[in-house]
């Protein structure tokens, strides 16, 4: 981090996937006048898509990210629906929604415990050397660290059942999905979902205690 009398530069940002920097400009009184979030890298995915069949977009655009490919996969699938003027059947909509809910489990777990946790859980006054995932696990306990891994595994298991792969799903097509799920998979998804809800409720309470209950943040 670089600091002068009128500008603070944080480069690189370490609490997200990818590269970025923040520049904060101060006025004469030292108050924030403007803040800019910048992504200095060029990905070029828009150019990859030019000239390709529209049906390839849900698979191709998912490669934008290895942490949130489901978001890009689903956005492209819904764009394909619009291109073809089709409304997916109710079952396909429910399965897509279920896949996205599983993505919520993995993504929110990652962000709260691994990316945001080093700051939110450890607190702004914690030593820099302790503001990492190991520091978070030390504070919340090894048992909770195991549940974090279990939550990500549960989400990825459901994503694989519906999306075809644990990372970079490939089953959404214009008008629906290219595959369904079996009765056994449905029962397993229900079991994993109930466990994930319990873990989410625990995580919300932890957030309330450690973050909302910290006067430095609220």
Role assignments for model-derived ranges:
Residues 1-218:
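Active-site bordering "gate/hinge" segments
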């Amino acid at each position: 981090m670089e600091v002068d009398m009128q500008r603070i530069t944080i480069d690189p940002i370490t609490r997200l996937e990818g590269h970025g920097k923040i520049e904060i400009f101060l006025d004469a009184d030292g108050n924030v006048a403007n803040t800019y979030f910048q992504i200095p890298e060029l990905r070029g995915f828009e150019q990859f898509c030019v000239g390709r069949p529209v049906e390839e977009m849900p698979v191709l655009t998912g490669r934008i990210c290895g942490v949130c490919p489901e978001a890009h996969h689903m956005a492209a699938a819904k764009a394909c629906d619009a291109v073809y003027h089709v409304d997916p059947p109710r079952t396909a909509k429910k399965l897509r929604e279920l896949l996205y809910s599983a993505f919520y489990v993995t993504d929110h777990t990652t962000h709260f415990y691994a990316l945001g946790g080093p700051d939110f859980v450890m607190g702004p006054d914690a030593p820099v050397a302790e503001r990492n995932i190991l520091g978070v696990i030390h504070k919340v306990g090894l048992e909770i660290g195991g549940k974090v891994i279990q939550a990500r595994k549960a989400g990825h298991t459901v994503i694989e059942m519906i999306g075809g792969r644990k990372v970079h799903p490939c089953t959404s097509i214009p008008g629906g999905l290219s595959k369904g799920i079996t009765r056994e998979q449905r029962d397993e998804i229900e079991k994993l979902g109930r466990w994930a809800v319990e873990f989410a409720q625990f995580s919300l309470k932890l957030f309330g205690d450690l973050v909302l209950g910290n006067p430095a943040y609220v």
